Curated annotation (Swiss-Prot):
Gene symbol of the encoding locus: nuo21.3c
Gene Ontology terms: cellular component: mitochondrion; respiratory chain complex I
One Pfam family this sequence matches: Fer4_7
Enzyme class per UniProt: translocase
Quaternary organization: Complex I is composed of about 40 different subunits.
Required co-factors: [4Fe-4S] cluster
Annotated keywords: 4Fe-4S, Electron transport, Iron, Iron-sulfur, Metal-binding, Mitochondrion, NAD, Oxidoreductase, Repeat, Respiratory chain, Transit peptide, Translocase, Transport, Ubiquinone
Organism from which the protein derives: Neurospora crassa (strain ATCC 24698 / 74-OR23-1A / CBS 708.71 / DSM 1257 / FGSC 987)
Name of the protein in question: NADH-ubiquinone oxidoreductase 23 kDa subunit, mitochondrial
Length: 219
């Protein structure tokens, strides 16, 4: 009984081994047969080389028609007249200016409260989050225990206008105004101090408050 069982197991093992050997060889042979081309590719198998303008063959009547009927000229005139009656795509800058998004990131500014007190609490989150290390802050404690900045400098030549300072500020003190026209003649004029930033905030406060209100539902 044991001998019969052992012989049966050996036969099954031989069959499995044979199948494992046959299956890969059959598959590989089939792939090799169908993957190898039997002959040259058919005509037009590859994309032909595009012809140049001097190699294109055109009928004589087509050439004469384009020459005498001036079809290309009338086609260009039609395009010009079509664009003439459409509204213009351009504006007369700087006399006309396009709309600006409330999220536009322009010149920096420091805001105040309606009472005139500056908003910045010298938490230095903007200085820490600035990837360009363009912000420098120094602060001191007041008699009432509150902290206020004694120095707030921004090197506008380093700023990448990412808006991280504005997003990190817990009191909406440092913001980026909608002003994009602050080109200067010297590099020193782009080194903003606290007084310059506060004056920008006083100048653009109505626009800044409106932009913050428009963006408040999404914050």
């Amino acid at each position: 009984m044991l001998t019969t069982t052992a012989s049966s197991a050996a036969a099954v093992a031989r069959q499995l081994t044979t199948r494992r050997v046959i299956a890969p060889s059959f598959v590989s042979q089939a792939i090799r047969t169908y993957a190898t081309p039997a002959g040259p590719p058919p005509k037009g198998f590859r994309i032909p080389t595009p012809k140049t303008w001097d190699q294109e063959e055109e009928h004589v009547l087509d050439k004469n028609g384009r020459y005498f009927l001036l079809t290309e000229m009338f086609r260009g005139m039609y395009v010009a007249m079509e664009q003439f009656f459409r509204p213009p795509y351009t504006i007369y800058y700087p006399f006309e200016k396009g709309p600006i998004s409330p999220r536009f990131r322009g010149e920096h500014a420091l805001r105040r409260y309606p009472s005139g007190e500056e908003r910045c609490i010298a938490c230095k989150l903007c200085e820490a989050v600035c990837p360009a290390q363009a912000i420098t802050i120094e602060a001191e404690e007041r008699a009432d225990g509150s902290r206020r900045t004694t120095r707030y400098d921004i090197d506008m030549t380093k700023c990448i206008y990412c808006g991280f300072c504005q997003e990190s500020c817990p009191v909406d003190a440092i913001v980026e105004s909608p002003n994009a026209e602050y080109a200067t003649e010297t590099r020193e004029e782009l080194l903003y101090n606290k007084e310059k930033l506060l004056s920008n905030g006083d100048k653009w406060e109505p626009e800044l408050a409106a932009a913050i209100r428009a963006d408040s539902p999404y914050r």
